[in-house]
Design a protein with these regions (language model features):
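Conserved beta-strand-loop-alpha-helix hinge in the C-terminal portion
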Residues: 205-231
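ABC ATPase NBD coupling module
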Residues: 48-62, 70, 92-95, 99, ...
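The feature captures the beta-strand-to-loop junction immediately N-terminal to the Walker
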Residues: 17-19
């Protein structure tokens, strides 16, 4: 990353685009604590977390990865995964399993996914489809209303119908809880459709930032022209990396 200066207001939903090697994943890993910056600092809700290890930083952060197999424990049941996510920010883990009220809360939460998972609490997560696991991962990441939600190409590995389902669910959950969110995507149309801010990265830098009303007027064609104007080169060479569907 090179001279990154990014400030998010509470409730901002920022979509991030850029071809492979632009620095998108590095940005996410810096925020989450997987990587540490050589210079500069990272603050979450005015708290300096720059040297805070990833496992401690996770109390502030929810993250969903591209791989549906990540983010859940496949050998555990849906209920056990939800209990684990629910207790993430608690001072002590659940000791006596899940009580009746907690189970009912889990069921009501799962109903919002519209996948009938509320009737499969005892099913092993490893038996779920990719779309079901990604929906569960998204729910788990937002359970405790994190200070910031990181979505790292979380629909890229799904078929089109499941990707649309997860996209719609993302919008619903983020809007419902007004979650401050950063979403990396290769799908330019998705980047335009979601969020109130958009940033474009290239070679480790933020080369374009668009906010609010200006973002609503953007089209894929305008984005590509803006890149060419800034960098003096075309994005067409990246058409296999940046989906326009």
């Amino acid at each position: 990353l090179d001279q990154i200066n990014l400030t998010l207001e509470k409730g901002d939903f920022v979509t991030v685009i850029g071809s492979n090697g632009a620095g998108k994943s590095t940005l996410m890993n810096m925020i989450s604590g997987v990587l540490s910056p050589d210079v500069g600092k990272i603050q979450i809700e005015n708290k300096d977390v720059t040297r805070l290890p990833e496992f401690k930083r996770s109390k502030f952060i929810g993250r969903v990865f591209q791989d549906p197999m990540a983010g859940t424990a496949p050998s555990m049941t849906i209920e056990e995964n939800l209990a684990m996510a629910f207790s993430r920010n608690k001072s002590r883990a659940l000791r006596k399993g899940v009580d009746k009220n907690r189970k009912e809360f889990f069921k009501e939460s799962l109903k919002t996914l519209h996948l009938n998972l509320e009737n499969r609490l005892n099913a092993k997560v490893g038996l779920l489809s990719g779309g079901e696991r990604q929906a569960l991962s998204l729910l788990m990441a937002t359970f405790t209303q994190p200070s910031i939600l990181l979505l790292d190409e979380h629909t890229a590995a799904l078929d089109p119908s499941r990707a649309r389902l997860i996209t719609d669910l993302t919008k619903e959950l983020v809007e419902k809880d007004q979650l401050t969110t950063i979403m990396v995507t290769h799908n330019m149309q998705q980047a335009l459709d979601l969020g109130n801010r958009l940033i474009m990265m290239d070679k480790g830098q933020i080369i374009l930032e668009v906010k609010e009303e200006e973002k609503k007027k953007l089209t894929i064609d305008l984005l590509m022209k803006e890149f060419q104007k800034i960098r003096g080169e075309t994005m067409l060479s990246d058409k296999t990396l940046l989906s326009i569907d």
